[in-house]
Structure formats: structure tokens, C-alpha cells
Amino acid sequence: MRLCILIPDDADLTRYADWREQAAQIDPLLKRRGIMPSYRPWTDDPPSDTDLVMPLMAWGYHRNTARWYAQLDHWSRLAFANPLVALRWNTDKRYLLDCAAKGVPIIPTQFHAAIAAADLDAARVAFKTETVVVKPPVSAGSDDTWLLKSPQTLPVAALGRAMLVQPMMPSILTDGELSLFYLGGTLAHAIVKRPTGGDFRVQPQFGGQSESIIPPPAAVAVAEQALAAVPGEVLYARVDLVGDGCSGFVVMELELIEPWLHLNRAADDGAAFADAIASACL
């Protein structure tokens, strides 16, 4: 069985050098099950000798969205671990609004095709908060993401661009952000990520820390609602949740393209991941 895993393109290999760290985790798991992984930049032509494709480390695609969509078309003759319809849907964070329309609890979210200064004031009124987060609908790693507390205004770099506006959820600072990992349709493991040093971002590059948890049933229920809203069945997913301040949870993000899987946090050391891939390659 042959598995092609997409990685950063040559221009981004230095920026995202840690793709090798995740590759080192998954290689032995896959090879023990007779799966031969190969790694290919997401900007390359499709291979002729693979059974399954995973864009698991296609980091950097968000900075060239047109090329990303074109590559999905270019590779469309191949089988993907998560179907192309799900990858396209998940590329743009307006999928949150689609989830909400299907009854999934999400973080309150506004979309502005060309954001203006007045939109920020209106969002603060609508969300009943002084502090909001502004981010592009296609983004990763908190690129071009701003935390703006009244009376702060939109940065020049954001004006006139397509942007999402969301309230800053206080529970991120107190309780952290939950990430639930689903492999082969089953909850495999979960972590809580917490910001440190006064930052609001939970990613490791900003000092965020994480630990394994057993997620509360209410969080699992919301995560599975979100997955049910996805177009097509997916082999792997990460669902990010945050407390809503009323003993419930809302979806912050649903990552179906290139999540860091945190297999080192899994009680089975990643066996569920490898088993899911093996089943898909049959």
C-alpha cells in the first residue's frame, strides 16, 4: 500500500521545517502495517504510483489559495483520505456559517467581504464585547490575525480585505481551547491548549502549551455535530472547541486538511491513526 503525504513546497520548507517531526512519528506506525509513505510538495504534479493522498502537512497553502484550489483539481483523479469536496469546503472558514445554519453551536462569527472601520464597531455592539478577533477566512497559524480591544481600530493591513470578526472568548484564557481528534470516524484522543505569557493564541510558536485530557461529554457531542455537517465522510479531523460561558461548548475551528495530530498525546501512541489509514488503503 502506498500513501502520498503532501508537505510544504520548496519555498516554505524552512518556515515549516517541523513537518519532519510529524513524519518521524507516523513513518514507523505506517510501515508496521505495510504502508509505504512518500512525501511530496503540495505544489508538485500528482504521482502515478500511490493508493491514497493526504494533505496532512500541506502547510503554507493558505498564502496561495488560487494555486491550492487549482492543485486540488489537478490531483482530482487520485483518492484522498478526506474527500476533495470536504477539503474545498474546509479551506475557507466561512464553513463555520454553514455549520451554524445546520444547527451546530459555533463561536459567533461575522463575515465582511471588504471590512471597514465601522464594521469593527458594529461587531463589538453585536457581540456585546469590547474585544474582538479579526482574521482572514483563509488562514492558518494565526497569520494576519488581530486581537483588537476598544478603542483599537482596524490595522491598515486589514482594511478593505475579506475578514471574519469574532468575539474574544474569555474561556480561552481561563480554561483553554479543546482539540478533539477523530480518526476513522472515532474519537481517538483529545488535548487542551492554553495560551501563556499574556498572549491569546494557543499555538506552540506563540508559547502555547498543551496536555492530554478526557473531554467532557458535552464537548464530544458538539464535536460530533460539527463532523456531521461536513460534506462527505472524513478519515481524519481535529475539532477545536471553547467554552461558551454557559457550561456549553462552541466550535472554534474544524481542521480537515493539515492538522498537527499530536499523536504523542494519544494513549495508543497513534495506532488508531495508522489503523484508519490501513483500512482506507485496502
Predicted feature residues:
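Conserved N-proximal alpha/beta basic substrate-recognition cap immediately N-terminal to
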Residues: R2, D9-A113
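Residue-level preference for long, well-ordered alpha-helices that form the structural scaffold
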Residues: R15, W19-Q22, N64, S212-P215, ...
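Anionic group-transfer/hydrolysis microenvironments
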Residues: A58, P137, M168-M169, F181, ...
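Short glycine-enriched loops at secondary-structure junctions
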Residues: W59, A86-W89, K193-P195, V242-C246
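Glycine-rich phosphate/pyrophosphate-binding beta-alpha loops
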Residues: W59, S142, T196-G197, E255-R265
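ATP-dependent carboxylate activation and anion-phosphoryl transfer catalytic cores
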Residues: P217-L282
